[in-house]
Swiss-Prot record:
GO molecular function per UniProt: ribosomal small subunit binding
Self-association and partners: Monomer. Binds 30S ribosomal subunits, but not 50S ribosomal subunits or 70S ribosomes.
Role, per record: One of several proteins that assist in the late maturation steps of the functional core of the 30S ribosomal subunit. Associates with free 30S ribosomal subunits (but not with 30S subunits that are part of 70S ribosomes or polysomes). Required for efficient processing of 16S rRNA. May interact with the 5'-terminal helix region of 16S rRNA.
Organism listed in the record: Pelobacter propionicus (strain DSM 2379 / NBRC 103807 / OttBd1)
Name this polypeptide is given: Ribosome-binding factor A
Single GO biological process annotation from the record: maturation of SSU-rRNA
Taxonomic lineage: Bacteria, Pseudomonadati, Thermodesulfobacteriota, Desulfuromonadia, Desulfuromonadales
Keywords of the record: Cytoplasm, Ribosome biogenesis
One CC-aspect GO term: cytosol
Cellular compartment(s): Cytoplasm
Length: 122
């Protein structure tokens, strides 16, 4: 990413995080945390990665709520950003945390089995 797209991504992250902390009038959006924002080089698209507390249905509902709030969020970004065209917003659930938790669980399981094997051989 260029310096310009990095700065724009940071501003989008801060602005939308602030809006979400105040709350949107959509009951589908649960407790959502933005994890990253990537803006393409031509500044036309911003991919916004988020996590949400709850099961798969809660995550899907939050994603649907965020997608339906795109227009409002772009208008709010327009009040803050000093660029001519506000990027299209694309919300994506960030699965990296779940992936990390799964790896951590597997490593703990391996360590437990290793400790059990050591105690049996002693």
């Amino acid at each position: 990413m260029s310096k310009r797209s990095e700065k724009l991504a940071e501003t989008i992250h801060e602005t939308i995080s602030s809006i979400l902390s105040r709350g949107l009038n959509d009951p589908r959006i649960g407790f959502v945390t933005l994890t990253a924002v990537d803006v393409v080089e031509d500044l036309s698209i911003a991919r916004i990665y988020f996590t949400a507390i709850g099961d798969r249905d809660a995550r899907k509902n939050s994603e649907a709520g965020l997608n339906s709030a795109k227009g409002y969020l772009r208008r709010e970004l327009g009040k803050v950003l000093t660029i001519r065209h506000i990027p299209e917003l694309i919300f994506k659930y960030d699965e990296s945390q779940e992936y990390g938790n799964r790896i951590d669980s597997i490593l703990r399981e391996i360590a437990t089995e290793h400790d059990r094997d050591d105690s049996e051989h002693s």
